[in-house]
Structure formats: C-alpha cells, structure tokens
C-alpha cells in the first residue's frame, strides 16, 4: 500500500481555524467546535492512504484539475493528489455554493 504525505495549505488551516472560531465563539459551543475540528483533522490525516477513494468535483475546471472532495459532516475538504503528496487546499462549509467558493479562491 502506497503512503502519501498529507500537506495542508495555510488557506485550509485558516479555514479550519475560522470554523472553530465560528462554532466556539459565535455559536458559544467550544466543546462542539473542538469535536468538529478534531473530526475534520482526523479525516484529513486518513488521506495518507487511498486518497482517490473520494470523488472528483463534477464541475469544471476543478474536475480537469483533479480536485477531489471529501465530505465530513457539513464540511467539504478539497484536495489534489500528486505523486506521493496529497495537498488539502480548502475546508469549506457544505451549505455554501461550493463551486463559486472554490472559483473565487483559485481562479
């Protein structure tokens, strides 16, 4: 079984920090915030093996770029697979217009 290095971009880390802050501070639920953060972080770390088990985006140009999406609760982890490396680019709230958010950030 091939193992991949999982690289999390600064932008994805900022997304995770923002989701933690939103739940902990704005929703006043710090325990829930930590639980959600930990579930996402744990799921991201599983991308070190078989990262292609999650589907590609259906829309373009993300599909052609090889951008995958992994759903964790109400959040979507966006990532690309290169030889030996999985790069997590975004962690987005699933209820948002995902295609538009990715387009705004990367194009």
Annotate each PLM feature.
Residues 1-63, 107:
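Basic, Lys/Arg-enriched alpha-helical interface segments
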């Amino acid at each position: 079984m091939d193992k991949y290095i999982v690289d999390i971009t600064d932008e994805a880390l900022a997304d995770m920090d923002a989701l933690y802050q939103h739940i902990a501070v704005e929703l006043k639920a710090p325990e829930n915030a930590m639980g959600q953060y930990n579930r996402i972080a744990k799921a991201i770390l599983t991308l070190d093996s078989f990262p292609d088990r999650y589907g590609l985006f259906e829309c373009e140009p993300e599909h052609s770029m090889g951008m995958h999406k992994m759903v964790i609760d109400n959040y979507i982890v966006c990532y690309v697979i290169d030889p030996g490396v999985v790069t997590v680019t975004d962690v987005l709230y699933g209820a948002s217009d995902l295609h538009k958010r990715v387009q705004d950030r990367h194009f």
